[in-house]
């Protein structure tokens, strides 16, 4: 018994592939798997299809969530229970499900709300690596709606986490580090009141949306 699934990057006939893959004995439903993948994407982890570190980080996140000494395994895909009778095998790319094999049920599992699942996953991680519940409940808005004084979550690629900073200005026609920043909002992450913040390219927000701090 279980809620089994296999996750792989092999696009064709996974049960005959020697591609490194992982096995989930529990929480193999699509809603849980999408939450695990979304969490890794938010963390900025390298995708498994491009870097073995991606598999390591995915296993780390899922293993922390389950705890214990079972529930997750890693092996060549052909050695795993791909045609498991539960959720089959998910093919993943860039932290998204892009293909499915051996799924024989009419309906997908949708028992878990994505936000609540992300919060549960986050709480199971080491404290220093957690986003915090407020991050997941924060309102996400397009960057063209930002105003000076807004406090937002900004991704820190070195620590793979988000930190809070205030929007303090918008780029002008002057190029920064060789790139145009006209109209792009920037925050007070690197710099000070004397030098300002517009000079550092790492202060500019380049994502389509951003989360507002409460």
Per-segment meaning from a language model:
Residues 1-6, 22, 26-32:
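His-enriched metal-coordination microenvironments in redox/metal-binding proteins
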Residues 4-9, 90:
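Short beta-strand scaffold segments in enzyme catalytic cores
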Residues 39-136:
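Low-complexity intrinsically disordered segments
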Residues 134-148:
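Mixed-charge, Lys/Arg-rich low-complexity intrinsically disordered regions
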Residues 173-186:
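Short, solvent-exposed secondary-structure boundary/capping segments
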Residues 183-214:
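Intrinsically disordered, low-complexity, charged/polar segments
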């Amino acid at each position: 018994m279980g809620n089994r699934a296999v996750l792989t990057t092999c696009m064709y006939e996974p049960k005959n592939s020697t591609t490194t893959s992982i096995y989930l004995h529990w929480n193999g439903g699509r809603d849980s798997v999408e939450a695990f993948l979304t969490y890794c994407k938010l963390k900025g982890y390298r995708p498994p299809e491009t870097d073995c570190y991606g598999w390591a980080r995915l296993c780390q996140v899922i293993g922390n969530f389950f705890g214990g000494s079972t529930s997750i395994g890693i092996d060549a895909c052909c050695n795993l229970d791909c045609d498991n009778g539960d959720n089959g095998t998910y093919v993943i790319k860039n932290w998204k499900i892009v293909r499915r094999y051996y799924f024989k049920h009419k309906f997908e599992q949708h028992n878990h709300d994505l936000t609540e699942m992300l919060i549960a996953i986050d709480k199971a991680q080491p404290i220093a690596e957690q986003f915090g519940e407020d991050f997941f409940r924060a309102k996400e808005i397009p960057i063209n709606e930002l105003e000076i004084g807004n406090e937002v979550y900004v991704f820190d690629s070195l620590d793979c986490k988000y930190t809070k900073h205030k929007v303090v200005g918008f780029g002008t026609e002057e190029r920064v580090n060789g790139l145009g920043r006209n109209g792009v909002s920037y925050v007070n992450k690197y710099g000070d009141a004397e030098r300002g913040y517009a000079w550092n390219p790492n202060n500019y927000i380049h994502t389509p949306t951003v989360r507002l701090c409460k």
